[in-house]
Every structure is written in C-alpha cells, then in structure tokens.
Amino acid sequence: MTMPVGSSIKPLTVYAPAIDLGASPASIAYNMPVPISGWKDSSGKDSWPKNYGGGGYKGPQSFRSALRNSYNTAAAQILMTYVGVSRSVEYLHLMGIPDKNINADPFGLALGSSGLTPVQMAVAFGTIANKGVYQQPLSFSRIVDSNGNVVVDMHQQQDRHQVFKPSTAYLVVDMLKEAVQSGTGTKAKISSQVVAGKTGTNSDSKGVFFAGMTGWYSGSVWIGHDNYKALSSKATGGNAAAPLWQSFMEKIHKAKNLDSREIIDGTPSDYNLVRVTPCGVSGQLATDACYNDVNGYKTITDYWSADSVPTAYCSMHKSVSVCTESGLLATDYCPSYSVETRGIVLIPRGHPLYDYIDAYGDTIRKYLGEFATLKSTNDIANHICQIHDAYTAAQQPSDLQNIVSDASNLVYTAYQLVGSAPDLSNDTRRQINTAISAVQTLLSLSPIDYTSLEGAVSNLRSQLQAAGLM
C-alpha cells in the first residue's frame, strides 16, 4: 500500500530539513494567498496551494505555528524558499525511502502526494525520535539453531546512520508535541505518555493518516478502502487516523506497563540551543520598530541552534510617526494623542514577496499594511493621513488632548488600584471594570466624542471614589 500520506510528510520533507539547514521554530513563513516562486499551476504560472478548507491565511507565521496548524501554504513556501525539492528528496533517501515512493515535485513533498508506506513513515518518524539517527527496520532480530547458537544476528547487519542533527531532532519533536497538545493531532493524546505526531489528509479523501511517537515507540496508521474509494468528506487525519493510532498505542503501553518518558531526553543547552527573539515578520533579529509593528505583529522567542543564530537585524521594519486613526503618516494636523511612533513594513528587493507586489498589491497590503507595496522609501512621504486637515483641526475642542490624556492615565490607574484591592466585592469590581471598558471603547473611536468621553471619565472616577480607592 502506497497511498499519499498528506500533511504527515511535512515534518520529514519541509520542517526538519529547513531546521537542519539553519532555520528555527521561530523562522517565518508567509501564509498568504500570494504566488510562491517555483510552485506552478497547470498552466505553468507561479501559484500557491490552498490551506485545508480554503481559508486559514494568517500572514507571517512562525514555523512552529504553521506546523501545529498544518497550513499548506506555509509548508509550500518553506519548501521552496528554505529547502528546495532536490534536498528534500535527499533527506527522504537518507531515511530509507526509495524513488518509487517519492513524488519528487513540490506538491509531493510539501503536501504529501508521495505514497510512502506505513512502515516507511513509522521508520522516518522514528528517525526523528532517535535523535536524528536512521535505523533500518527489521522483521526479525536473529536466528538461532537448536543448540542456541546465533546463526544470524540482524542487529550486526542493520544500517544505522545520522540523517538530522540531534539539535534538529530535538526541536522538531518539540514542535510535534505541540501539534498533539493543541494542534490538529489532539485525539492522539495518551494519558501518562508524552506523544508527538502529525496528521495527514489526502486531498481527494481517499485516505487519512497519522504518524507519531512516544518515548518508547514510533508508529503510523493509514485508513482507507482497499479499492481506494473515497472516504467521507468529513474524515480527516485528526478525527479518524489519530484516534485509531491512540487506541492501539495506548494498549501497547499499558500492556507493557511503560512509564512516561521524554521522547528525546536532555535540555536545550545539551543540544547547543539558545533562545533568540526575532521579528515576527522578517525572522531577523528584532529592532524597536518590530516591537511597535503598526499591524500588530509581535516578536517571537524560541530556540535556535547556536551555530545558526541570525546576525542581521530586521530589514523590513522602519520606524515612522503614524496617525493611529488613519494608519498613515502623521501630519501637523493630526492631534497629538493620535500620533505614535510605529514600525511599518516595507518589502526589500530579493524578498520572496517582492516580485508579486504589483499583481497582488491588495493582498499584500491586507496582511502587511499600507506601506508594504512601496518599492522605494522615497514613496513613504506620499502616504499621509487623509483624515486630519486644517478644517478638522479647527473643529477639535481645545481641551480634547487633555481629556484623552486624562482618560488614558485614569484607565491605567484604575487597573492598578483594582489589582491591589483583593477585598473588593464582586459587584464593585464588576462595576469598575464596566466603567473602564466604557472609557477604553470611547478612546478607540475615530473621531473621539469629547462629551461622551468626558462623561465616561467622570463615571469611572466616581466608581473608584465610591469604592474607597481614590
């Protein structure tokens, strides 16, 4: 049986190779409906694969998040940008998988149209669990004669060799544990055992897959018809294959009375791994602009092999004064309360998204902001706030800035006071929190209603005074 294994292949052909080549769980993939260079559609044009269900586009995502949620677009982008088809195939060869089981193209490697057998998948996942060391599968261990003499010892002939670095294996196991704890493989959990694994769903519903590991065993399961008739469209690796895998693996561990143990023992430092905080958009070392991203993207802190830690600082963020009401460059007419220093995103030449700025500008702006489609920093000055001008500035009450400042400070003070007053009754606490929310809501509006905000501030102050906090 060599039916396609679906997304179960991603750790073997995409994530582990990328990390082995210098990436990290914190590296960034672009989970966006934008073409991927080298990913061709039927007409030969650059395209991208859809995520399961057709949605799930999240913009820049860490490898860890993309694997946990099994996003196809991210996996395809990682394969084509970080690994390459030929190197991905080489890793499969090192895990004992012959060419006849490999579709050596982007679709076969990133999305699992390759037809690996359950044994091959169990061995490959076992390679990761065994600190990156492949062990040739054996159907018997030895042959002895009637006198107990060993005639054949298969362990002496067994092929063993390193495929992935131990540090790579450690990180990938950690990522796969998350896929079971909170991702697509939650139904593979075994009580009192550490479990890591990956689901797979064939694109035409002809089979579903789960491959996983514990501290004791690796195993895989495929569910499908022997005539390859399509399963129910509702069948997935997560809701069908994972629970079946869980059922027989749990029985094995209980029958052998096996205690829980880590799949790979040791600590990150044992594998020369260090924690690094890169930008959540570029994957390079974070700058102040990254921490203040105007689109709300955050930095990511995760482990990296010490010999491949990024050394370059983010080349995609630039700090500018932004009007928070329009999201564009602030002008002299923007009220000071709406002006903040934020990091905007610019796509540098050579970036995987750069060549698609013209044709997919609207999509890129949706995920990366208004400035992301500018090809020159000189163009930034043309993207100024259109909400505030001389007329709107003249209409603003002279003391609006003061009430906004007072409101912001009062909200902060209220949180501090409530947090340091454990004896408040539930009703009083609820009333104060409601008053805080009212002020915050009015502060978020554009334009700000001066009269309403003034009333909300007065109410919050009264609530705090009534509670004896002011």
Feature names for model-found ranges:
Residues 23-88, 134, 146-178:
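Conserved catalytic neighborhood of penicillin-recognizing serine enzymes
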Residues 43-51, 82-123:
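Mid-domain, small-residue-enriched loop/turn segments at the edges of structured enzyme/sensor domains
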Residues 4-31, 66, 124-128, 172, ...:
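Active-site SXXK
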Residues 396-446, 467:
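Amphipathic, heptad-repeat alpha-helical segments
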Residues 272-398:
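Low-complexity, Gly/Ser/Thr/Pro-rich intrinsically disordered linker/tail segments
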Residues 28, 65, 75-79, 91, ...:
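Structural recognition of the beta-strand scaffold that forms the well-ordered cores
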Residues 1, 5, 115-123, 127-316, ...:
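A penicillin-recognizing enzyme superfamily signal
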Residues 380, 385-391, 395-397, 439, ...:
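Repeat-associated, polar segments at repeat-unit boundaries in modular proteins
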